Amino acid sequence: MPACKDPRWAYGALAWLIFFVVSHVVLVFYPGDDPTDGGPWSLRAYVIFNVVLISVSAAGAVVVHATVRPWARHLPRWLLLPPLLAGSILLVIRGVPGMVENLLMVTGVRRGGFVGADDISTGEFWAGLGINTYFFLGAVLLVGTTVSYGRRRS
């Protein structure tokens, strides 16, 4: 998929964002036995954190969707490009180190990743790989969307 002027990046990023929002809505309503994992924060902080993530991601989904819809063609470039850049930067900051951590874990250099314990369970190992890959995919899709939008509108 060439990066320039291809709307498929935006549709991929939109699907990623929708899944992210839905998964965090589920986490708010069904937090499990101990969603704070014994941390110093309360259930209220956990819910507030997830509501902020849901709100920012839903706004991001609207922005991404606007990059490929006819109703948004009249919107000025400065309205859509900064949030796309900000989201891309955040996902790259989360996704790229996650993939480096995946490489460390898979090669056995550091089975627990950057800060994990050396004796993690198989479930924790695979969950870490899945989550890191998921965020890396989000970074790739949103960066592709940002580049595609930037080239389309120039």
Residue ranges of each PLM-predicted region?
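Extended intrinsically disordered, low-complexity coil regions enriched in Ser, Thr, Gly, Ala
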Residues: 8-9, 26-39, 104-112, 151-154
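Interfacial non-cytosolic loop connecting adjacent transmembrane helices
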Residues: 35-41, 97-128
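C-terminal TM-helix exit segments that contain a strictly Trp-centered aromatic cap at the helix terminus
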Residues: 19-31, 89-106
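Cytosolic juxtamembrane helix at the C-terminal end of the final transmembrane segment
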Residues: 2, 8, 67-73, 140-154
